[in-house]
Amino acid sequence: MFDRELEAFGFEKTDDLIKIVPPDLFAELCQQSVQHLQRQRSGVDCQVIFQSFQAAGVLISEDELRKIIRWITTLFSTAAKYNVTCEELLSRLISKLPKQILQVIRHVWNEEGKRLSELEKSRDLLPSGELVDFQWKIGMAVSSDSCRSLNHPYVTIELKVADYSGQITSKVFELTIPEFQNFHKQVKEMSSVLETV
């Protein structure tokens, strides 16, 4: 079952990407992914890690980095789900990954595997999306496609959300004042409902 889940996820496609990642950066990715699975952190901030990769001279796109993060998160959560030993885990990867990467996986699984497996028994290990940060600011439209929008205030909202794999993404959108007031009203309604629970 463990093998089938890994195959269904498409691990074969990510192996080549992982081969170009230096062991120290791979270890950092593993650590952040495990902390996310243990709910010690909201997620893995892909943009910050991507900057580390660029500074280290690793030529990889942000999209490819996201695939690697998903690979790591799925590897450890699936291994925890099936409570595999370190040797079982490595036996499935030994022909596909470099020795240094396997050493990192061995170290992380020996340190955290038991705890992840225990957490898996008590709850679903893959958390749902989580709001990490909420920022807003008021602005004034100084250029517009329609003259009616000129010199009208608007609210810019930035949401940082961690998805199930721990990747943090930013979503930015603008609302007119009436749209923001409606948004505010709906959030207040949610808050009052939560107070009754």
UniProtKB/Swiss-Prot annotation:
The answer to whether the entry has keyword Transcription is: yes
The answer on whether this UniProt entry bears the keyword Methyltransferase reads no
State the disulfide connectivity: none
Q: What domain of life?
A: Eukaryota
Q: Name one GO cellular component term.
A: cytoplasm
Question: Which residue numbers delimit the COMM domain?
Answer: 130-197
UniProt feature coiled coil, ranges: none
Give the UniProt subcellular location, in the record's own words. Nucleus; Cytoplasm
Q: What are the entry keywords?
A: Cytoplasm, Nucleus, Transcription, Transcription regulation, Ubl conjugation pathway
Q: Pfam families from the xrefs?
A: COMM_domain, COMM_HN
Q: Which family does it belong to?
A: Belongs to the COMM domain-containing protein 6 family.
Record's subunit section: Component of the commander complex consisting of the CCC subcomplex and the retriever subcomplex. Component of the CCC subcomplex.
Instruction: Report the function annotation for this chain.
Output: Scaffold protein in the commander complex that is essential for endosomal recycling of transmembrane cargos; the commander complex is composed of the CCC subcomplex and the retriever subcomplex. May modulate activity of cullin-RING E3 ubiquitin ligase (CRL) complexes. Down-regulates activation of NF-kappa-B. Inhibits TNF-induced NFKB1 activation.
Name of protein: COMM domain-containing protein 6
Organism encoding this protein: Xenopus tropicalis
